[in-house]
Each structure stands twice: as structure tokens, then as C-alpha cells.
Design a protein with these regions (language model features):
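Aromatic- and glycine-rich beta-strand/loop motifs that create alpha-glucan
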Residues: 1-24, 231
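Transmembrane helix boundary and interhelical loop/hinge segments in multi-pass membrane proteins
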Residues: 14, 65-85
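Hydrophobic alpha-helical transmembrane segments of multi-pass membrane transport/permease proteins
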Residues: 16-40, 51-64, 108, 176-188, ...
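Hydrophobic alpha-helical transmembrane segments that constitute the membrane-spanning cores
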Residues: 31, 91, 96-125
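Membrane-interfacial helix-loop-helix connectors in multipass membrane proteins
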Residues: 38-49, 115-143, 195
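A structural motif at transmembrane helix-loop-helix junctions in multipass membrane proteins
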Residues: 71, 130-178
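Junction motif at the cytosolic side of a transmembrane helix
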Residues: 163, 210-231
């Protein structure tokens, strides 16, 4: 319950900033704009549609980067870190609350983005073709991949945020990560058809292992003694 209350506070603080809302809407609209502006899109192969659907699901998840980047540094600069650490809440509940505050809104944005893309793609490519390419199972897989993406980015950026001296430094790191995400998603379109299934499965397992490592590090860094020592 305490973790959920902390997550609620994180979400309210994150989206009380108008810039955060504008950034989220831009990331939702970007894949839709690209398929509408691409004149050759109507005759594109199914892989083309899947790539843009993947981008539609993953790009809004990048909002999690900024939320996670300020998780420690922002608390320190706002002088709310000590009261938080002094509150009757366990270290694991702090980590869980922060992580839920990162994952929940980004996952919701991914759902909205995928559904919006589905509607726009149906208009562009035809409802019958989109219903076949983006069937419910594929949409669920895209959403699951988005959640994994959010968890991975959120966990590791939270770890980095706990080590930097200021929120500005954390935001700069978040910007670099976001730029890498955009470049990586753009590169997918040229190699997606050549990636073996076994390699994809191995990559997913490696990511899950890295998530566990990041969560363990985050829990250690949010330990009261560790956190107070860095103030």
C-alpha cells in the first residue's frame, strides 16, 4: 500500500509538468505521422507495418526515462529525500513505488499509442490487412515488449540517477539514452527481417537478467545508509 501511495505521488509530480504531457503526445504522434507522410507506405510489406507498430509501442515508453532520471536527484534537490528516508517505509517499498511510478504511466501511453496507430494504419493500409498483420496476439506481444522495454530503461536509469550529483545531470543522461533509443528503433527497419528467432529469444533472456541485476542495484542504492551517505 505504501509503495502504491509513493507511486501515485511520483505520477502526479511527473505529469503536473506540461512539457511532459507534450513530449508524450509527440512520441505517440510520431509513428502515425511517418506512415501518413510516406508516399510509398501503401504498398509496403508487412514487416514495414510491424516496425512502425513496434515504434508506436516503444517510443512512448521513452517517457519513463525522464521519470526514472529524476527519481533520486530530484528528491535530493527538492529536499524531500531525507523525509522520505525517515518515513516508516521499507527500502524495497521505496524502490517498488518509484518503479511503479515509472512503469504505470509509460505502459498506459504505450497502450494508447498502439491503439491509435492501429486506427491510423487501418485507414492507411486497409482495415482487413491491418486486422491480419496486427492481430490481437501480435498486439499483446508488442505491448509485452513495450513493458519489458520500460522496465529495463526505468531500472537502469534509476540506478544511474542515484549516482549523479544533480537532476540536471540525470536529465542529460536521460537525453542521451533517449537519443540512442530513437536511433536504435530507426535501425530496426533495416535488419528486422535478418534477425534469427533464437537470437531474439536470447536477447529477451539477457534483458530479463539485466533487469534483475538493475533492481538489485536499485534496492541497494536506495538503502537508507547508502542514500544518506551520498547526500
Amino acid at each position: 500500500m505504501k509503495a502504491l501511495l509513493l507511486a501515485r505521488r511520483e505520477i502526479v509530480e511527473q505529469y503536473s509538468d506540461r512539457a511532459s504531457i507534450v513530449r508524450a503526445l509527440f512520441l505517440i504522434a510520431l509513428p502515425i505521422a511517418l506512415i501518413q507522410l510516406n508516399r510509398s507506405a501503401a504498398g509496403a510489406p508487412d514487416a514495414f507495418i510491424l516496425v512502425f507498430a513496434l515504434q508506436a509501442g516503444l517510443l512512448p515508453a521513452a517517457t519513463a526515462i525522464n521519470a526514472a532520471a529524476g527519481s533520486f536527484a530530484a528528491e535530493k534537490e527538492a529536499q524531500t529525500l531525507v523525509p522520505l528516508l525517515a518515513a516508516p517505509i521499507r527500502d524495497i517499498e521505496i524502490v517498488a513505488g518509484k518503479l511503479i511510478g515509472v512503469i504505470a504511466p509509460a505502459a498506459a501511453l504505450s497502450i494508447v499509442s498502439l491503439l491509435t496507430f492501429y486506427a491510423a494504419a487501418s485507414q492507411r493500409f486497409g482495415a482487413g490487412r491491418i486486422a491480419e498483420v496486427l492481430d490481437p496476439v501480435t498486439m499483446a506481444e508488442l505491448f509485452g515488449l513495450s513493458v519489458l522495454f520500460i522496465l529495463t530503461l526505468g531500472s537502469w536509469v534509476m540506478v544511474v540517477s542515484a549516482r549523479v550529483p544533480s537532476q540536471r545531470a540525470a536529465q542529460q543522461i536521460a537525453g542521451l539514452v533517449l537519443a540512442g533509443v530513437v536511433v536504435g528503433l530507426t535501425a530496426i527497419s533495416s535488419v528486422i527481417g535478418n534477425i534469427p528467432t533464437g537470437l531474439i529469444a536470447g536477447g529477451v533472456v539477457a534483458v530479463l537478467v539485466s533487469d534483475l541485476v538493475a533492481l538489485q542495484l536499485a534496492q541497494r542504492l536506495w538503502n537508507r545508509e547508502e542514500a544518506v551517505a551520498r547526500l
